[in-house]
Every structure is written in structure tokens, then in C-alpha cells.
């Protein structure tokens, strides 16, 4: 079965969420990791899983369960030693092509719902937030929203996401608070004085942040929320887990509640009376 294929044709008409896997995994693995979440969202959303464009070593703990699920992929460079330099514009083109391929394939399978949201884990969460930021800064320069040449992303769900965000359109966004698409994904956060010097990097579109309280990167995830999201636009879910996608029923139900709330507030879903 192709990585982004849904086995349930009853979701073809539903609004869609594009899902971006973490570094060192792939769309097939992320679909498996999100299997419980997909089930609980299946009455409201269709989830589509995109595959990153660049080859990668497997991520931490990936081979213990998914050793036979390669090849493993990444959206960004994780290290200068393991991943060759790439021109930022070419990197952005490759990322956009991967997203477009997944969306086009889902269209060919008969899906008709609007592309409404983004959902990503770890490096994929960084990319989701960066895609929202690109849309935000591009919309600010347009004379009309109808001039948008892609999906209208209403919200993003960020599981274990960290900054800094990535500028996917340097012509619209140049800020010391963001890095380019050819940079190293694990770059340290900019100095707080640089972050405080402007607001071009600050997301105002709605986000849901999912923080595992046992995740070694928890403080970095909290920094993404505090330094890159406008107050009042984000909601946070904390759960007793490490660096992984929640699968226990109580955690998934809580996460689904946040997704449905933000989808209703943004007009993707109708408010229940």
C-alpha cells in the first residue's frame, strides 16, 4: 500500500490534514505511528502522509521496530558531517515537490476534501510551523487572499516541535530568527535579543502543541511555543510520554479534542449545537 493511501474510502469527502514525519523515518512509518490518532480522527478528517525528499540515516530507536521499513528520509539536514550542503532554494523546491506529490496522489485516489491542516512530528513539526509561517508572510503581501496559489492552511498540530523555524521564501521573510532550508535542523535558538528585535518570525495562525513531559527535548519544544507563537493563538497538550506519538486512548482522545476545537474555531468544521 502506498505510504499516503487511506484504506477507508468513507473519508474521501472529509477535510484533509497533511502529515509530515520526523527526520530519519518516512511516510509509511509515520502512518503506523499515527494509527490510533488516525482512527479517532476518521469521522472528521482524512489524513494524508507525505514523504520527505532527502535520504537519511534512521532516527533514534527507529530500527528497533521499523528496521525493514526503509529507506529513511529527512526534510532538513541533521548534521554537516552526514548530510551534504544544498542550496536553500533547491532544498525548498524539493520539499514543496514532495508535499505536492502526496497531495496529488490523494486527489487521484478520489479525495475531494479541502486541505485544511498540517500535522507533524519532531522535524516534521518544524516544517509544519514553517509552512504556516510562509503562508502568513505571503498573505501579508498579497492584495487579495484569492491570489493564493496553494492550500489555505488553517492550523497546524505540532508534536515535539522545536525551533528555529525555516524560511521557505527568503524573498518574503528575512529575519535573524529563522534559518534557511539548506541549514542544519538542530541549529540552536537565536539569541533572545534577536528574537525580541522583531515579530516577522512570530506565528499568528492557530497551532496545537503536543509536549511529552518525559521528552529530553521538552524545553526546546516549550521555546518554540514561547518564542515563535503569538500569545492567544496556541493551545498546549502535555502528556506523560517521551519523544514519540501518543498511542494510549486517554492521550489520543485529549489530542483529538484539541484538533476538533481548533478546526471548529477556524471554520473547517461546523460548530456542534
UniProtKB/Swiss-Prot annotation:
Induction profile: Expression is positively regulated by the azaphilone pigments (MonAzPs) gene cluster-specific transcription regulator pigB.
**Protein's UniProt keywords contain Hydrolase:** yes
UniProt pathway: Secondary metabolite biosynthesis
Q: Which domain of life is it from?
A: Eukaryota
Q: Name one GO molecular function term.
A: hydrolase activity
**Enzyme class, one word?**
hydrolase
Q: What's the practical application here? A: As colorants, MonAzPs are widely used in various food products for centuries. Moreover, MonAzPs also possess wide-ranging biological activities such as antibacterial activity, preventing hypertension, lowering cholesterol levels, causing hypolipidemic effects, and displaying antiobesity and antitumor activities.
Q: Which residues form the active site?
A: 122 (charge relay system), 215 (charge relay system), 243 (charge relay system)
Alphabetical list of Gene3D superfamilies matching this protein = alpha/beta hydrolase
Q: What is its EC number?
A: 3.1.2.-
Alphabetically list the UniProt keywords. Hydrolase, Pigment
The UniProt entry's GO biological process terms, in alphabetical order, are: secondary metabolite biosynthetic process
Matching entries from PANTHER family are given as: ESTERASE DBAE-RELATED, ESTERASE OVCA2
* Function description: Esterase; part of the gene cluster that mediates the biosynthesis of azaphilone pigments (MonAzPs), a complex mixture of compounds with a common azaphilone skeleton very widely used as food colorants. Within the pathway, pigG may assist the nrPKS pigA in the biosynthesis of the hexaketide precursor. The first step of the pathway is performed by the nrPKS pigA that forms the hexaketide precursor from successive condensations of five malonyl-CoA units, with a simple acetyl-CoA starter unit.
The similarity annotation says:
Belongs to the LovG family.
The protein depicted here goes by the name Esterase pigG
Amino acid at each position: 500500500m502506498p505510504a499516503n493511501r487511506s484504506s477507508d474510502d468513507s473519508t474521501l469527502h472529509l477535510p484533509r490534514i497533511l502529515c509530515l514525519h520526523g527526520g530519519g523515518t518516512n511516510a509509511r512509518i509515520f502512518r503506523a505511528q499515527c494509527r490510533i490518532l488516525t482512527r479517532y480522527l476518521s469521522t472528521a478528517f482524512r489524513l494524508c502522509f507525505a514523504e520527505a525528499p532527502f535520504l537519511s540515516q534512521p532516527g533514534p530507536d527507529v530500527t528497533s521496530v521499523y528496521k525493514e521499513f526503509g529507506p529513511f528520509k529527512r526534510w532538513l539536514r541533521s548534521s554537516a558531517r552526514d548530510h551534504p550542503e544544498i542550496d536553500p532554494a533547491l532544498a525548498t523546491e524539493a520539499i514543496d515537490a514532495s508535499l505536492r506529490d502526496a497531495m496529488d496522489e490523494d486527489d487521484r485516489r478520489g479525495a475531494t476534501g479541502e486541505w485544511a491542516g498540517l500535522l507533524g512530528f519532531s522535524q516534521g513539526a518544524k516544517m509544519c510551523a514553517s509552512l504556516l509561517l510562509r503562508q502568513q508572510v505571503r498573505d501579508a503581501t498579497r492584495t487579495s487572499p484569492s491570489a493564493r496559489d496553494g492550500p489555505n492552511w488553517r492550523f497546524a498540530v505540532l508534536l515535539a516541535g522545536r525551533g528555529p523555524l525555516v524560511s521557505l521564501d527568503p524573498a518574503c521573510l528575512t529575519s535573524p530568527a529563522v534559518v534557511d532550508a539548506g541549514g542544519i535542523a538542530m541549529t540552536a535558538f537565536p539569541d533572545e535579543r534577536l528574537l525580541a528585535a522583531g515579530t516577522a518570525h512570530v506565528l499568528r495562525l492557530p497551532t496545537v502543541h503536543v509536549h511529552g513531559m518525559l521528552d529530553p527535548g521538552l524545553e526546546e519544544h516549550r521555546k518554540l511555543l514561547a518564542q515563535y507563537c503569538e500569545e492567544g493563538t496556541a493551545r498546549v497538550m502535555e502528556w506523560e510520554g517521551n519523544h514519540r506519538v501518543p498511542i494510549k486512548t486517554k492521550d489520543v482522545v485529549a489530542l483529538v479534542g484539541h484538533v476538533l476545537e481548533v478546526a471548529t474555531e477556524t471554520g473547517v468544521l461546523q460548530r456542534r449545537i
